[in-house]
Amino acid sequence: MTNIRKTHPLMKILNDAFIDLPTPSNISSWWNFGSLLGLCLIMQILTGLFLAMHYTPDTSTAFSSVAHICRDVNYGWFIRYLHANGASMFFICLYAHIGRGLYYGSYMFQETWNIGVLLLLTVMATAFVGYVLPWGQMSFWGATVITNLLSAIPYIGTTLVEWIWGGFSVDKATLTRFFAFHFILPFIITALAAVHLLFLHETGSNNPTGIPSNMDMIPFHPYYTIKDILGALFLILALLALTLFTPDLLGDPDNYTPANPLSTPAHIKPEWYFLFAYAILRSIPNKLGGVLALLLSILILIFIPMLQTSKQRSMMFRPFSQLLFWTLIADLLTLTWIGGQPVEHPYIIVGQLASILYFFLILVLMPTVSLIENKLLKW
């Protein structure tokens, strides 16, 4: 008799995706982040659900409802900090996953890659609206500053901002709709993740060499399930260490002050995972220019497959491209640091140079160096 997992309509889908899936035999731990992102998503949905049971999306009670969760709800503080730090772990995994895709040429699976970029944008939107919910000072002013950027859009900008706000300033209507968005978006992310997997399983996984591995596949279970469980344990350990020892390490102290429209914080800045984009936004003195640069800093990922000039898919055997890749990582870390600094000398010029380098590396240097490496292959 055939095993039920191979015949049952629903079990068959799961079997083909997680058990009998043919997987390259040589993929490294960098391929672990896909499943870790799935774990993060499940964790965020569950902790978020329990938080939503006690949270009230109203300007007069939002801040105190979060305090109530932390003080009066059983393990409320734990759920709240798991959710807040879980978002940070989510972005760490997300950036590692994208970095892996860039390094090993996974972007050549264009459908999978484009859905991935869409997923990144959706996760960023979810994190942004979620940060507004505790209704602290940074929540309020972050929402005001970032939504106000839309007013830079010619002709319809101001109308658009007031439409998103639901009034003439960030207020009760804004908070209510942001809570609604924050609740619905994770389910959209789940659906997109399923499509992401669907497209991936059409082509099969890439591997570190970038060479087709159809002749050397092994079943996903047990070989990679066991490796994924190890990765998951590391992730959970890191998350628990962060949550139980230094829960506020990545947060902003200003968010422990209730939102006050009459007092602006000295330095308005988003969470750490948005700082690189925020630095690019601030490095351009023009409002519309800054908004376009901000958008392009993320959307540039869509153009990566079109900028592929190398004959080799992976960077594994391309030392010059590797050097540029790690320069890009260093540049992004520099931008992240600059995004958290005040707008004054020398941070302004460093941010501008780092922003120029970011686009120059991706659009000019990497494709050019790939062409040079192609020439070197003929020597």
Swiss-Prot record:
Alphabetized InterPro entries for the sequence: Cyt_b/b6_C, Cyt_b/b6_C_sf, Cyt_b/b6_N, Cytb/b6-like_sf, Cytochrome_b, Cytochrome_b_C_euk/bac, Cytochrome_b_N_euk/bac, Di-haem_cyt_TM
Pfam families with a match to the protein in the record: Cytochrom_B_C, Cytochrome_B
Cofactor dependence: heme b
Coiled coil start-end: none
UniProt keyword Coiled coil present: no
Keyword check for Cell cycle: no
Localization annotation: Mitochondrion inner membrane
Residues that bind heme b b566: 97, 196
GO biological process: mitochondrial electron transport, ubiquinol to cytochrome c
Membrane-spanning segments: 33-53, 77-98, 113-133, 178-198, 226-246, 288-308, 320-340, 347-367
Record: residues binding a ubiquinone: 201
UniProt remark on cofactor binding: Binds 2 heme b groups non-covalently.
Binding site for heme b b562: 83, 182
Annotated keywords: Electron transport, Heme, Iron, Membrane, Metal-binding, Mitochondrion, Mitochondrion inner membrane, Respiratory chain, Transmembrane, Transmembrane helix, Transport, Ubiquinone
Stored CDD domains: cytochrome_b_C, Cytochrome_b_N
SUPFAM superfamilies assigned: a domain/subunit of cytochrome bc1 complex (Ubiquinol-cytochrome c reductase), Transmembrane di-heme cytochromes
GO cellular component, one term: mitochondrial inner membrane
Family: Belongs to the cytochrome b family.
Function: Component of the ubiquinol-cytochrome c reductase complex (complex III or cytochrome b-c1 complex) that is part of the mitochondrial respiratory chain. The b-c1 complex mediates electron transfer from ubiquinol to cytochrome c. Contributes to the generation of a proton gradient across the mitochondrial membrane that is then used for ATP synthesis.
Subunit comment: The cytochrome bc1 complex contains 11 subunits: 3 respiratory subunits (MT-CYB, CYC1 and UQCRFS1), 2 core proteins (UQCRC1 and UQCRC2) and 6 low-molecular weight proteins (UQCRH/QCR6, UQCRB/QCR7, UQCRQ/QCR8, UQCR10/QCR9, UQCR11/QCR10 and a cleavage product of UQCRFS1). This cytochrome bc1 complex then forms a dimer.
Misc note: Heme 1 (or BL or b562) is low-potential and absorbs at about 562 nm, and heme 2 (or BH or b566) is high-potential and absorbs at about 566 nm.
Name used for this protein in its record: Cytochrome b
Organism of origin: Lissodelphis borealis (Northern right whale dolphin)
Taxonomic lineage from the root: Eukaryota, Metazoa, Chordata, Craniata, Vertebrata
